[in-house]
Amino acid sequence: MNSLLMITACLFLIGTVWAKEGYLVNKSTGCKYGCLKLGENEGCDKECKAKNQGGSYGYCYAFACWCEGLPESTPTYPLPNKSCGKK
């Protein structure tokens, strides 16, 4: 019983540590999602937790939305072959 509990705890920790994080990016422009209120930010948290993003938590860092707990399928800044504001 103790072994099963330890294995479950380890798997949970591995999933938490290996979760993707990064700046949310607009797929069409290649730019980060901007924000003004640094730290806890309701807008960033809402965007990160949106169904199409799948994150677990979001906040404003360096005037852009930073997300934690993202699935690998969610793109983060920078996008390959796409520069923000450059054509």
From Swiss-Prot:
LCN-type CS-alpha/beta domain residues = 20-85
Task: State the SMART domains in the record.
Answer: Knot1 (SM00505)
The answer to whether keyword Transcription regulation applies is no
User: Disulfide bonds, which pairs?
Assistant: C31-C84, C35-C60, C44-C65, C48-C67
Q: Which PROSITE patterns match?
A: LCN_CSAB
**At the top level of its lineage, which domain of life is listed?**
Eukaryota
Q: Name the protein family.
A: Belongs to the long (4 C-C) scorpion toxin superfamily. Sodium channel inhibitor family. Beta subfamily.
What does the entry note on its domains? Answer: Has the structural arrangement of an alpha-helix connected to antiparallel beta-sheets by disulfide bonds (CS-alpha/beta).
Q: What is this protein called?
A: Toxin CsEv3
